[in-house]
């Protein structure tokens, strides 16, 4: 078993991606001997691959934050004002919480009406229920404007 392990890393290092692609094709086509050898190669590759997948997951979670948009709005409202990372994190959590409340309320409304789909009408009603007074009016008008812009062009 030790010679097999010694043979595999040099082929991976020297060949890089080209041998890996060549090895995957025979596996798809089948071959009992190659199939037995490949799991050990897979085991050697999986930590690297799983590490890359974890990096991709981290990147996806970064995409899900609203930090960039919070910063853009801050600069529109107060161009010479900054924001700390802790304050940015709090604002991001606040937006996530509000969106979750609106989504939950919209889901309840669609269930009450026995409709399988959450439409813009349910979202609008949920916003009116979740947000207080004047804030709800502004949110509804901005949301209506955004939906109109999205559907028209």
Curated annotation (Swiss-Prot):
Assembly information from the UniProt record: The nucleosome is a histone octamer containing two molecules each of H2A, H2B, H3 and H4 assembled in one H3-H4 heterotetramer and two H2A-H2B heterodimers. The octamer wraps approximately 147 bp of DNA.
Family: Belongs to the histone H2B family.
Region (Disordered): 1-61
Post-translational modification: The N-terminus is blocked.
Protein name in the entry: Histone H2B.1
Keywords: Acetylation, Chromosome, DNA-binding, Isopeptide bond, Nucleosome core, Nucleus, Ubl conjugation
Subcellular location, record wording: Nucleus; Chromosome
GO-annotated cellular components: nucleosome; nucleus
InterPro entries: Histone-fold, Histone_H2A/H2B/H3, Histone_H2B, HISTONE_H2B_site
Family annotation (PROSITE patterns): HISTONE_H2B
Main location: nucleus
Cross-link (Glycyl lysine isopeptide (Lys-Gly) (interchain with G-Cter in ubiquitin)): 149
Modified residues annotated as N6-acetyllysine in this record: 41-42
Biased composition (Basic and acidic residues): 1-10, 20-54
Protein purpose: Core component of nucleosome. Nucleosomes wrap and compact DNA into chromatin, limiting DNA accessibility to the cellular machineries which require DNA as a template. Histones thereby play a central role in transcription regulation, DNA repair, DNA replication and chromosomal stability. DNA accessibility is regulated via a complex set of post-translational modifications of histones, also called histone code, and nucleosome remodeling.
GO-annotated molecular function: DNA binding; protein heterodimerization activity; structural constituent of chromatin
């Amino acid at each position: 078993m030790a010679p097999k392990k010694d043979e595999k890393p040099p082929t991976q290092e020297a060949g890089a991606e080209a041998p890996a692609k060549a090895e995957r094709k025979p596996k798809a086509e089948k071959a009992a001997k190659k199939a037995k050898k490949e799991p050990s190669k897979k085991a050697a590759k999986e930590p690297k691959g799983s590490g890359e997948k974890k990096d991709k997951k981290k990147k996806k979670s970064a995409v899900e934050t609203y930090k960039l948009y919070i910063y853009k709005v801050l600069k529109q409202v107060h161009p010479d004002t900054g924001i700390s990372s802790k304050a940015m994190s709090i604002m991001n959590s606040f937006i996530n919480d509000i969106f979750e409340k609106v989504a939950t309320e919209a889901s309840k409304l669609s269930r009450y009406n026995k409709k399988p789909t959450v439409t813009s009408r349910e979202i609008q009603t949920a916003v009116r229920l979740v947000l207080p007074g004047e804030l709800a009016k502004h949110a509804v008008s901005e949301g209506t404007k955004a939906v109109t812009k999205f559907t028209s062009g």
